[in-house]
Regions:
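Short hydrophobic segments within beta-strands
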Residues: 10-12, 58, 90
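A late-sequence structural motif
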Residues: 63, 73-117
Length: 121
């Protein structure tokens, strides 16, 4: 665990002081910190920064497996148990009854339910 925390990490920038990412929030609750060597504005940039480095990017297994299929990346279990990440669909109230928007929300929900792993509540 100490090696993991001391290693160089790629981390997304905090949304705001009171709105940090899942990893930082969880570590803070455990009174732990990690070495945030590279801070990025766009989460999707991180996997492309990793090949050829010893940088660590802590993400969900599903996300890691997707990028390991297209980039030379190693997936290693974290020595710290992180909570299950919950994803939500949010939309403006004026789109609530839009047929095309309802279709898209249904499609996204069906795709999520068809994937292995923890399911939404």
């Amino acid at each position: 665990r100490e090696d993991y925390l001391a290693a160089d990490h790629v981390a997304p920038s905090d949304y705001a002081i009171q709105h940090r990412g899942v990893v930082e929030t969880h570590l803070s609750g455990l009174r732990l910190t990690r070495e945030r060597r590279v801070v990025i504005s766009y989460f999707s940039m991180a996997p492309y920064l990793l090949p050829g480095t010893d940088l660590i990017f802590t993400v969900t297994r599903h996300y890691a497996e997707h990028f390991a299929e297209i980039l030379p990346l190693a997936i290693i279990d974290s020595p710290i148990d992180y909570p299950v990440v919950q994803f939500y669909q949010l939309w403006h109230e004026r789109m609530q009854h839009s047929p095309t928007h309802r279709w898209l929300r249904t499609l996204v929900g069906e795709m999520r339910r068809s994937r292995p792993g923890p399911q939404p509540a």
